[in-house]
Amino acid sequence: MTLRLKNAEMHEEINKPIFVVGSPRSGTSILAWCLGYHPNIFPVPESNWMGDFAVNLAKSYQIGAARGIFSILSAMGISHEEFFSHIGRSINSLVLKHRCDLDRQRLIIAVQRLLKERGLYLGEVTGEFDAATSAAVEQYEMVDKTLYSELVDSLRTAGSDSEYKTRWVDQTPEYSFHICGLRKLFPSALFIHIVRDVDSVVRSMLNFHRIAGTHLAANEEEAYKYWLRTVRACLKAEEAYGPHVVYRLRYTTLLENPESTLRSLLDFLGEPYSAKCLEPLSERINSSNVPPDFKSEDPATDPAIVEEARRLSAEIEQTSRPTECSPAAAEELEAEFGTRIKHLARVQ
């Protein structure tokens, strides 16, 4: 498959990735899933690497321009902005180039899981259509010929849905702390800050290990602190870059008024409304499947931390997002980015 990039303007036009940020267990995944049903947007797995990559890239630029006319970047007049955005365009092109491969792998994973449930496939779920998977698919024909036919057709056409999609959405929560760096890589990127009431998030965080086997937070106090850090970082980005770059979305409005919420969101993204984006919401959302009787309270938790988080959560519910950008806040984020570069230099 080849990308249909007719000219430089087309290349610029499609270099507009979307990042869903916010605290873990706030709805980042379901929102990205909804957007992934749009005819022009496809979801990618949480990437995690691009935030730190931007910091390393900035350090590399400093080295490459350290000696003025005797360093390649400065001698050739390659600016910090050009250096970053050029590499960002390369990342974007690479993601677009392999979008059909991602679709195919996801489909094969779904097929392998289905076959394992039916006892026809005993191997690992790898996303690779190996000999064992092929043999299991053939066996499946004897079990359900109709579904077998649909399954084979799906495997043959895997990737066709995403072939002409020109934008991707990433839902890595940790990117809440890296919005400044990501904007250097992708100057036209848009960010969606999805926010959910803190108590629900904490319950979901503490219950997460029951279904995923890993802990998002060691205890209740750490969960409240985690929510505070991520949400404050996103609020600072809202203030710094304004409503044309960072869009605040409340988790409750997505559930209670999905159509109007997605219409408004897609308008922000510059995409036409598509009712297909509602399809993932037709299934009941139960974040982390938190049991009604699940107890998250810990007597060792500092009540001041809980109060601080609940107060901020209530303020967010009662206030609107900023109506304009703040140069002062943007400078703060630039300073934080610079501090990370200095820290990297020290540890290296």
Sequence positions of predicted segments:
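PAPS-dependent sulfation machinery
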Residues: F42-L114, M142-S176, I211-A212, E297-D298, ...
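A conserved segment at the C-terminal end of the G1
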Residues: S29-I41
